[in-house]
Amino acid sequence: MSKIKLSLFCILALCGCGQASQNTENQPVTVACYYFPNYHTGDPRNEAAKGVGWTEWELVKKARPRFAGHRQPKVPLWGYTDERDPLAMAQKIDAAANHGIDAFIFDWYMYEDGPFLNRCLDEGFLKAKNTNRLKFSLMWANHDWVEIHPYKRGTDQQLLYPAKVSPKRYDEICDHLVKDYFTKPNYWLIDGKAYFSIYDVQKFVENFGSIEATREAMNRLRNKAIAAGLKGVHWNIVAWGLPILPVENPPANTAELIQLLGFDSATSYVWIHHAQLPDVQTDYNKARDAYFAHWDKAKKEYGVPYFPNVTMGWDSSPRCDLNDEWGNWGYPFTNTLGNNTPENFKTALQQTKDKLLADPNGPRILNINCWNEWTEGSYLEPDTKTGMAYLEAVRDIFGNEK
Protein backbone atom coordinates (compact mmCIF):
# COMPACT_ATOMS: atom_id res chain seq x y z
CA MET A 1 0.00 0.00 0.00
CA SER A 2 2.98 2.32 0.55
CA LYS A 3 3.37 2.79 -3.22
CA ILE A 4 -0.09 4.18 -3.64
CA LYS A 5 -0.45 6.45 -0.61
CA LEU A 6 -2.58 9.45 -1.51
CA SER A 7 -4.24 12.19 0.43
CA LEU A 8 -7.26 10.51 1.98
CA PHE A 9 -9.13 13.78 2.02
CA CYS A 10 -8.70 14.25 -1.72
CA ILE A 11 -9.69 10.68 -2.48
CA LEU A 12 -12.87 10.89 -0.46
CA ALA A 13 -13.80 14.08 -2.24
CA LEU A 14 -13.24 12.47 -5.62
CA CYS A 15 -14.99 9.15 -5.05
CA GLY A 16 -17.86 10.29 -2.85
CA CYS A 17 -17.62 7.33 -0.50
CA GLY A 18 -20.81 6.47 1.35
CA GLN A 19 -21.65 7.85 4.75
CA ALA A 20 -23.95 6.38 7.37
CA SER A 21 -27.60 7.09 6.73
CA GLN A 22 -29.21 9.48 9.15
CA ASN A 23 -32.61 9.35 10.82
CA THR A 24 -32.97 5.59 10.48
CA GLU A 25 -34.50 5.08 13.91
CA ASN A 26 -38.00 4.28 12.66
CA GLN A 27 -36.99 2.29 9.57
CA PRO A 28 -37.66 -1.47 9.54
CA VAL A 29 -34.71 -3.83 9.26
CA THR A 30 -34.07 -5.14 5.75
CA VAL A 31 -33.19 -8.84 5.79
CA ALA A 32 -31.10 -10.05 2.87
CA CYS A 33 -29.95 -13.64 2.35
CA TYR A 34 -27.05 -14.97 0.30
CA TYR A 35 -27.91 -17.51 -2.40
CA PHE A 36 -25.35 -19.96 -3.85
CA PRO A 37 -26.50 -20.99 -7.36
CA ASN A 38 -24.89 -24.38 -7.98
CA TYR A 39 -28.03 -26.52 -7.78
CA HIS A 40 -29.23 -26.43 -11.37
CA THR A 41 -28.62 -28.52 -14.44
CA GLY A 42 -27.39 -27.32 -17.79
CA ASP A 43 -24.42 -25.20 -16.76
CA PRO A 44 -21.90 -25.64 -19.61
CA ARG A 45 -18.84 -25.52 -17.35
CA ASN A 46 -20.23 -28.02 -14.87
CA GLU A 47 -21.30 -30.39 -17.61
CA ALA A 48 -17.90 -30.23 -19.30
CA ALA A 49 -16.10 -30.95 -16.04
CA LYS A 50 -18.56 -33.29 -14.28
CA GLY A 51 -20.93 -34.67 -16.88
CA VAL A 52 -24.43 -33.95 -18.12
CA GLY A 53 -26.92 -33.27 -15.35
CA TRP A 54 -24.36 -32.72 -12.58
CA THR A 55 -25.24 -30.30 -9.79
CA GLU A 56 -23.89 -29.82 -6.28
CA TRP A 57 -26.79 -31.94 -5.05
CA GLU A 58 -24.55 -34.90 -5.93
CA LEU A 59 -22.22 -33.97 -3.08
CA VAL A 60 -25.16 -33.49 -0.71
CA LYS A 61 -26.48 -36.96 -1.53
CA LYS A 62 -23.11 -38.66 -1.04
CA ALA A 63 -22.16 -36.97 2.25
CA ARG A 64 -21.52 -39.28 5.21
CA PRO A 65 -20.77 -38.84 8.94
CA ARG A 66 -17.04 -38.20 9.45
CA PHE A 67 -16.86 -38.22 13.27
CA ALA A 68 -18.99 -39.14 16.29
CA GLY A 69 -22.17 -37.07 16.45
CA HIS A 70 -21.79 -35.78 12.91
CA ARG A 71 -25.17 -35.37 11.20
CA GLN A 72 -24.75 -36.22 7.54
CA PRO A 73 -26.23 -36.51 5.01
CA LYS A 74 -28.64 -33.58 5.15
CA VAL A 75 -31.77 -34.35 3.14
CA PRO A 76 -33.76 -31.47 1.59
CA LEU A 77 -37.44 -31.55 2.51
CA TRP A 78 -38.41 -30.23 -0.93
CA GLY A 79 -36.28 -32.79 -2.72
CA TYR A 80 -33.31 -32.22 -5.00
CA THR A 81 -34.99 -29.52 -7.03
CA ASP A 82 -33.57 -27.74 -10.07
CA GLU A 83 -33.30 -24.04 -9.28
CA ARG A 84 -33.34 -23.00 -12.94
CA ASP A 85 -36.97 -24.22 -13.07
CA PRO A 86 -39.20 -21.17 -12.45
CA LEU A 87 -41.70 -23.35 -10.58
CA ALA A 88 -39.03 -24.64 -8.21
CA MET A 89 -37.72 -21.12 -7.72
CA ALA A 90 -41.24 -19.81 -7.07
CA GLN A 91 -41.45 -22.14 -4.08
CA LYS A 92 -38.23 -20.66 -2.70
CA ILE A 93 -39.38 -17.09 -3.32
CA ASP A 94 -42.68 -17.64 -1.54
CA ALA A 95 -41.01 -19.34 1.41
CA ALA A 96 -38.49 -16.53 1.77
CA ALA A 97 -41.02 -13.72 1.41
CA ASN A 98 -43.48 -15.41 3.77
CA HIS A 99 -40.82 -15.68 6.48
CA GLY A 100 -39.50 -12.12 6.61
CA ILE A 101 -36.73 -12.17 3.99
CA ASP A 102 -36.64 -9.12 1.73
CA ALA A 103 -33.88 -9.90 -0.77
CA PHE A 104 -31.63 -12.60 -2.17
CA ILE A 105 -27.98 -11.68 -2.74
CA PHE A 106 -26.90 -14.05 -5.49
CA ASP A 107 -23.30 -15.24 -5.52
CA TRP A 108 -22.46 -14.13 -9.05
CA TYR A 109 -19.66 -15.58 -11.18
CA MET A 110 -18.35 -13.88 -14.30
CA TYR A 111 -15.05 -14.62 -15.99
CA GLU A 112 -13.08 -13.49 -19.00
CA ASP A 113 -14.64 -16.18 -21.17
CA GLY A 114 -18.20 -15.84 -19.91
CA PRO A 115 -20.59 -16.53 -17.04
CA PHE A 116 -20.77 -19.44 -14.62
CA LEU A 117 -23.80 -20.64 -12.60
CA ASN A 118 -25.97 -17.90 -14.10
CA ARG A 119 -28.97 -19.96 -15.20
CA CYS A 120 -30.43 -20.11 -11.69
CA LEU A 121 -30.89 -16.34 -11.69
CA ASP A 122 -31.55 -15.77 -15.39
CA GLU A 123 -33.93 -18.67 -16.03
CA GLY A 124 -35.21 -19.49 -12.55
CA PHE A 125 -35.53 -16.43 -10.36
CA LEU A 126 -36.15 -13.76 -12.99
CA LYS A 127 -38.69 -15.92 -14.87
CA ALA A 128 -40.63 -17.04 -11.80
CA LYS A 129 -44.16 -15.62 -11.81
CA ASN A 130 -43.72 -14.31 -8.28
CA THR A 131 -40.23 -12.87 -8.78
CA ASN A 132 -41.35 -9.42 -7.65
CA ARG A 133 -42.11 -10.73 -4.15
CA LEU A 134 -38.37 -10.50 -3.44
CA LYS A 135 -35.70 -7.98 -4.23
CA PHE A 136 -32.46 -9.36 -5.60
CA SER A 137 -28.89 -8.17 -5.91
CA LEU A 138 -25.45 -9.52 -6.76
CA MET A 139 -22.23 -10.27 -4.94
CA TRP A 140 -19.49 -10.70 -7.51
CA ALA A 141 -17.68 -13.83 -6.29
CA ASN A 142 -14.51 -12.63 -7.99
CA HIS A 143 -12.22 -15.39 -6.80
CA ASP A 144 -10.40 -18.05 -8.76
CA TRP A 145 -12.52 -21.21 -9.06
CA VAL A 146 -10.58 -24.32 -8.15
CA GLU A 147 -11.58 -27.99 -8.16
CA ILE A 148 -13.02 -28.75 -4.71
CA HIS A 149 -16.22 -30.58 -5.68
CA PRO A 150 -15.03 -32.82 -4.10
CA TYR A 151 -11.44 -32.24 -3.06
CA LYS A 152 -9.00 -35.12 -2.57
CA ARG A 153 -6.57 -34.16 0.17
CA GLY A 154 -2.96 -33.81 -0.85
CA THR A 155 -3.65 -33.18 -4.52
CA ASP A 156 -3.15 -29.89 -6.32
CA GLN A 157 -6.31 -27.84 -6.34
CA GLN A 158 -6.68 -27.42 -10.07
CA LEU A 159 -7.40 -23.88 -11.20
CA LEU A 160 -10.42 -24.08 -13.49
CA TYR A 161 -11.52 -20.47 -13.96
CA PRO A 162 -9.14 -17.59 -13.14
CA ALA A 163 -10.76 -14.47 -11.73
CA LYS A 164 -8.83 -11.87 -13.74
CA VAL A 165 -10.74 -10.05 -16.47
CA SER A 166 -9.38 -7.66 -19.10
CA PRO A 167 -10.39 -3.97 -19.22
CA LYS A 168 -12.48 -4.64 -22.32
CA ARG A 169 -14.22 -7.56 -20.63
CA TYR A 170 -14.86 -5.49 -17.51
CA ASP A 171 -16.64 -2.83 -19.55
CA GLU A 172 -18.78 -5.52 -21.18
CA ILE A 173 -19.60 -6.87 -17.72
CA CYS A 174 -20.63 -3.39 -16.56
CA ASP A 175 -22.98 -3.00 -19.52
CA HIS A 176 -24.47 -6.42 -18.79
CA LEU A 177 -24.98 -5.57 -15.11
CA VAL A 178 -26.82 -2.35 -15.84
CA LYS A 179 -28.92 -3.60 -18.75
CA ASP A 180 -29.89 -7.03 -17.46
CA TYR A 181 -29.94 -6.65 -13.69
CA PHE A 182 -29.66 -3.18 -12.14
CA THR A 183 -32.61 -1.80 -14.09
CA LYS A 184 -34.96 -4.67 -13.22
CA PRO A 185 -37.93 -3.42 -11.16
CA ASN A 186 -37.06 -5.73 -8.25
CA TYR A 187 -33.32 -5.10 -8.13
CA TRP A 188 -32.35 -4.04 -4.62
CA LEU A 189 -31.59 -0.33 -4.44
CA ILE A 190 -30.24 1.60 -1.46
CA ASP A 191 -31.08 5.30 -1.71
CA GLY A 192 -31.74 4.79 -5.42
CA LYS A 193 -28.39 3.08 -6.04
CA ALA A 194 -27.97 -0.53 -7.15
CA TYR A 195 -26.42 -2.66 -4.41
CA PHE A 196 -23.38 -4.46 -5.82
CA SER A 197 -20.96 -6.33 -3.59
CA ILE A 198 -17.37 -7.47 -4.12
CA TYR A 199 -16.32 -10.69 -2.40
CA ASP A 200 -12.52 -10.41 -2.68
CA VAL A 201 -11.31 -6.82 -2.65
CA GLN A 202 -7.65 -7.86 -2.76
CA LYS A 203 -8.26 -9.79 -5.97
CA PHE A 204 -10.32 -6.87 -7.30
CA VAL A 205 -7.43 -4.43 -6.89
CA GLU A 206 -4.94 -6.92 -8.33
CA ASN A 207 -7.17 -7.26 -11.39
CA PHE A 208 -6.82 -3.57 -12.27
CA GLY A 209 -3.25 -3.16 -11.05
CA SER A 210 -3.54 -0.14 -8.76
CA ILE A 211 -5.83 1.69 -6.38
CA GLU A 212 -6.30 4.50 -8.88
CA ALA A 213 -7.26 2.14 -11.72
CA THR A 214 -9.64 0.22 -9.47
CA ARG A 215 -11.33 3.38 -8.29
CA GLU A 216 -11.71 4.55 -11.87
CA ALA A 217 -13.23 1.19 -12.84
CA MET A 218 -15.74 1.48 -10.02
CA ASN A 219 -16.67 4.97 -11.17
CA ARG A 220 -17.24 3.71 -14.72
CA LEU A 221 -19.93 1.37 -13.44
CA ARG A 222 -21.43 4.18 -11.36
CA ASN A 223 -21.61 6.40 -14.43
CA LYS A 224 -23.22 3.69 -16.54
CA ALA A 225 -25.87 3.18 -13.87
CA ILE A 226 -26.56 6.91 -13.69
CA ALA A 227 -26.88 7.07 -17.48
CA ALA A 228 -29.52 4.32 -17.22
CA GLY A 229 -31.62 6.41 -14.83
CA LEU A 230 -30.38 5.18 -11.45
CA LYS A 231 -28.70 7.33 -8.83
CA GLY A 232 -25.58 5.25 -9.08
CA VAL A 233 -24.12 2.07 -7.62
CA HIS A 234 -23.98 1.25 -3.93
CA TRP A 235 -20.59 -0.47 -3.82
CA ASN A 236 -20.34 -2.94 -0.94
CA ILE A 237 -17.21 -4.73 0.25
CA VAL A 238 -17.24 -8.17 1.84
CA ALA A 239 -14.70 -7.88 4.64
CA TRP A 240 -12.91 -10.88 6.07
CA GLY A 241 -9.91 -11.55 8.22
CA LEU A 242 -9.57 -15.34 8.23
CA PRO A 243 -9.25 -17.00 4.81
CA ILE A 244 -11.51 -19.97 4.07
CA LEU A 245 -11.08 -20.95 0.43
CA PRO A 246 -7.57 -22.00 -0.65
CA VAL A 247 -7.41 -19.03 -3.04
CA GLU A 248 -8.14 -16.42 -0.37
CA ASN A 249 -5.62 -13.92 1.00
CA PRO A 250 -7.08 -11.26 3.31
CA PRO A 251 -6.08 -7.65 2.52
CA ALA A 252 -3.50 -6.02 4.74
CA ASN A 253 -5.74 -3.12 5.71
CA THR A 254 -9.43 -3.44 4.90
CA ALA A 255 -10.34 -0.11 6.51
CA GLU A 256 -7.80 1.73 4.37
CA LEU A 257 -8.97 0.06 1.18
CA ILE A 258 -12.58 0.95 1.94
CA GLN A 259 -11.65 4.62 2.12
CA LEU A 260 -9.19 4.67 -0.76
CA LEU A 261 -11.59 2.93 -3.13
CA GLY A 262 -14.75 4.71 -2.04
CA PHE A 263 -16.93 1.81 -0.98
CA ASP A 264 -20.37 2.79 0.30
CA SER A 265 -20.72 0.02 2.89
CA ALA A 266 -19.14 -3.13 4.24
CA THR A 267 -20.47 -6.50 5.29
CA SER A 268 -19.41 -10.12 5.85
CA TYR A 269 -20.27 -13.35 4.08
CA VAL A 270 -19.99 -15.83 6.94
CA TRP A 271 -18.93 -15.82 10.59
CA ILE A 272 -16.07 -18.20 9.81
CA HIS A 273 -14.21 -15.32 8.16
CA HIS A 274 -13.90 -13.83 11.65
CA ALA A 275 -14.23 -16.70 14.13
CA GLN A 276 -11.77 -19.51 14.76
CA LEU A 277 -13.06 -23.09 14.93
CA PRO A 278 -10.81 -24.72 17.55
CA ASP A 279 -12.99 -27.78 18.09
CA VAL A 280 -14.35 -30.43 15.74
CA GLN A 281 -17.79 -29.08 16.67
CA THR A 282 -17.10 -25.54 17.85
CA ASP A 283 -20.01 -24.15 19.83
CA TYR A 284 -22.24 -21.93 17.70
CA ASN A 285 -22.62 -19.33 20.43
CA LYS A 286 -18.84 -18.95 20.81
CA ALA A 287 -18.54 -18.25 17.09
CA ARG A 288 -21.38 -15.74 17.38
CA ASP A 289 -19.60 -13.89 20.17
CA ALA A 290 -16.35 -13.81 18.20
CA TYR A 291 -18.18 -12.43 15.19
CA PHE A 292 -19.94 -9.78 17.29
CA ALA A 293 -16.50 -8.62 18.48
CA HIS A 294 -15.52 -8.18 14.83
CA TRP A 295 -18.74 -6.26 14.19
CA ASP A 296 -17.96 -3.83 17.00
CA LYS A 297 -14.46 -3.33 15.61
CA ALA A 298 -15.71 -2.85 12.05
CA LYS A 299 -18.18 -0.17 13.13
CA LYS A 300 -15.34 1.80 14.71
CA GLU A 301 -12.72 1.36 11.99
CA TYR A 302 -14.37 1.16 8.59
CA GLY A 303 -15.88 4.63 8.32
CA VAL A 304 -18.89 3.39 6.33
CA PRO A 305 -22.10 1.59 7.35
CA TYR A 306 -21.49 -2.04 8.26
CA PHE A 307 -24.25 -4.56 7.54
CA PRO A 308 -23.93 -7.47 10.00
CA ASN A 309 -24.17 -11.13 9.13
CA VAL A 310 -25.97 -13.98 10.86
CA THR A 311 -24.64 -17.42 9.94
CA MET A 312 -26.85 -20.50 10.26
CA GLY A 313 -24.07 -23.10 10.47
CA TRP A 314 -20.83 -24.48 9.07
CA ASP A 315 -19.89 -27.94 7.81
CA SER A 316 -17.94 -28.16 4.55
CA SER A 317 -17.35 -31.92 4.82
CA PRO A 318 -19.62 -32.77 1.82
CA ARG A 319 -16.96 -31.16 -0.39
CA CYS A 320 -14.30 -33.61 0.86
CA ASP A 321 -13.38 -36.85 -0.86
CA LEU A 322 -15.11 -39.61 1.07
CA ASN A 323 -12.08 -41.88 0.82
CA ASP A 324 -9.81 -39.45 2.67
CA GLU A 325 -9.11 -39.50 6.39
CA TRP A 326 -11.06 -36.81 8.20
CA GLY A 327 -9.23 -34.02 10.02
CA ASN A 328 -8.84 -30.26 10.31
CA TRP A 329 -6.39 -30.13 7.41
CA GLY A 330 -7.60 -26.97 5.67
CA TYR A 331 -10.63 -26.19 3.53
CA PRO A 332 -12.80 -28.11 2.87
CA PHE A 333 -11.37 -30.33 5.62
CA THR A 334 -12.28 -27.95 8.46
CA ASN A 335 -13.85 -28.10 11.87
CA THR A 336 -17.57 -27.44 12.03
CA LEU A 337 -20.09 -25.43 14.01
CA GLY A 338 -22.07 -27.48 16.52
CA ASN A 339 -25.09 -26.56 18.62
CA ASN A 340 -26.45 -24.42 15.79
CA THR A 341 -30.02 -25.23 16.74
CA PRO A 342 -32.96 -23.23 15.43
CA GLU A 343 -33.27 -21.77 18.93
CA ASN A 344 -29.66 -20.55 18.99
CA PHE A 345 -30.01 -19.20 15.47
CA LYS A 346 -33.12 -17.31 16.56
CA THR A 347 -31.24 -15.87 19.53
CA ALA A 348 -28.47 -14.67 17.20
CA LEU A 349 -31.07 -13.00 14.98
CA GLN A 350 -32.66 -11.26 17.96
CA GLN A 351 -29.32 -10.07 19.31
CA THR A 352 -28.33 -8.77 15.88
CA LYS A 353 -31.60 -6.91 15.57
CA ASP A 354 -31.18 -5.43 19.04
CA LYS A 355 -27.66 -4.22 18.23
CA LEU A 356 -28.86 -2.62 15.00
CA LEU A 357 -31.76 -0.84 16.68
CA ALA A 358 -29.56 0.37 19.54
CA ASP A 359 -27.87 2.78 17.11
CA PRO A 360 -30.51 5.38 16.19
CA ASN A 361 -28.54 6.60 13.17
CA GLY A 362 -27.04 3.30 12.07
CA PRO A 363 -28.00 1.07 9.15
CA ARG A 364 -31.09 -1.11 9.23
CA ILE A 365 -29.76 -3.94 7.08
CA LEU A 366 -28.43 -7.42 7.81
CA ASN A 367 -27.66 -10.47 5.74
CA ILE A 368 -27.93 -14.18 6.44
CA ASN A 369 -25.62 -16.97 5.38
CA CYS A 370 -27.17 -18.68 3.61
CA TRP A 371 -30.31 -19.71 1.75
CA ASN A 372 -28.72 -22.86 0.36
CA GLU A 373 -25.05 -23.47 1.15
CA TRP A 374 -25.88 -27.14 1.70
CA THR A 375 -22.32 -28.37 1.21
CA GLU A 376 -21.02 -25.80 3.69
CA GLY A 377 -23.71 -26.61 6.24
CA SER A 378 -25.39 -23.19 6.21
CA TYR A 379 -28.89 -23.16 4.75
CA LEU A 380 -32.37 -21.89 5.58
CA GLU A 381 -34.11 -24.23 3.16
CA PRO A 382 -35.97 -26.96 5.06
CA ASP A 383 -34.46 -30.38 5.60
CA THR A 384 -36.16 -33.56 6.76
CA LYS A 385 -35.04 -33.15 10.39
CA THR A 386 -35.68 -29.50 11.24
CA GLY A 387 -38.33 -28.68 8.64
CA MET A 388 -39.04 -24.96 8.38
CA ALA A 389 -37.59 -24.18 11.82
CA TYR A 390 -34.81 -21.86 10.63
CA LEU A 391 -37.14 -19.91 8.37
CA GLU A 392 -39.65 -19.72 11.20
CA ALA A 393 -36.92 -18.20 13.37
CA VAL A 394 -36.45 -15.43 10.80
CA ARG A 395 -40.20 -14.89 10.63
CA ASP A 396 -40.53 -14.73 14.41
CA ILE A 397 -37.90 -11.99 14.70
CA PHE A 398 -38.51 -9.98 11.52
CA GLY A 399 -41.77 -11.11 9.93
CA ASN A 400 -44.00 -8.77 11.90
CA GLU A 401 -42.14 -5.75 10.51
CA LYS A 402 -43.09 -6.44 6.90
Predicted regions and their residues:
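Bacterial Sec-dependent signal peptides at the C-terminal "C-region" and cleavage site
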Residues: 10-26
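Sec-dependent signal peptide recognition
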Residues: 2-9
